[in-house]
Amino acid sequence: FADCNYFPYVAVAVRSIVETASSENAYDVLVFTDADVRTSIRERLLDVTRGCSNVSLRLVVLEKTDLAPISGLFVGGLSAMTYGRLLLPSLLANYRRAIYLDVDIVVREDLAHLFGVDLKGNLLGAVKDEGVIRFPFPPQWREDILRECPDFDFGPYVNAGVLLMNLEGIRREKSMVRALELAVRNRFILCDQDALNIAFVHRLFLLPVQWNQCTKALPIEPSTGSPDVLGVHRGIVHFTEVKPWRDLRRNTLAWMWWDVASRTSYYRDFLLMAERTNRLVRAKVCDLLKLWIVTRADNRLARHKCPSFLFAAHLSKWRNKLVEKGLLAE
């Protein structure tokens, strides 16, 4: 689910699917969007799968009637399309099983391996969200969930960025209808993710951590004890914290995303965007440092009654340091 502004990131995600796809399988990739797309934008995105006969990429434009069940829901600063996954059982009425993927991911292993996982009779397969469980969240988060489900166990709370869905079973048991009802009458901090965890509380299958390696949980070894967490093998990397296209330095796995991005027609756009972001960050850091320098110098003047020429020399010294670090132009 994405609007036109997210198509460049969709392209990277789809490209990673193409590059890990097996020639023995056929892959049907659907991108749902909430507005009609100009031909030029559509063609640029579809170019990602050009020459790959076993990967089909289709854009599905949703009408207002399709989105009516999620219109007006609390989004907490996110796009309303975040609730789109709750509509999948009805939108994919002719499908028995599907994989849902967030946009901010890179696929590192053939998705056919995930698609074939036995859910053991459950309706939804997902990976435990170590980042949410281990990191401090406001008490309101737990209170909201427990109000709807008093015996809720937060131990197996899952991340909704990668979902293996038993669509046939979900439609039969109306589990997604329940999730929608929960989302409508609550303002959950984590929106539809909280609603999904409650609605599927007894019908969840925990997938191996490799299928949704959230970057927020990287410093933490999941309770599964899987060696894949900081190792080489990662089925899907999910950039849940700092997005790689925004800050490469603060993301240890950003290179994986940029490696795939370099083989899309959006690569130059990403580079220009990163350069603009870098300039803004450097300008902000420079302003903060200059403010700190002036404040520090003012304090010294007040304490030691320094002559003005010493004050000027002090600023000059720090200015030179800023230039050396590339934070200030000469």
Regions found by a protein language model. Name each.
Residues 35-42, 134-135:
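Short, charged/polar "capping" segments at the starts of alpha-helices
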Residues 116-179:
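Conserved catalytic core of nucleotide-sugar-dependent glycosyltransferases
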Residues 15, 42-46, 108-120, 176:
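Short alpha-helix within the catalytic core of nucleotide-sugar-dependent glycosyltransferases
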Residues 42, 46-91:
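Active-site-proximal specificity loops/subdomain of glycosyltransferases
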Residues 27-35, 126-128:
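Short internal beta-strands
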Residues 59-61, 65, 81-137, 164-165:
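GT-A fold catalytic core of metal-dependent nucleotide-sugar glycosyltransferases
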Residues 2, 6, 160, 165-330:
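A glycosyltransferase accessory/donor-loop signature
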Residues 16-25:
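Short, acidic, metal-binding catalytic loop of nucleotide-sugar glycosyltransferases
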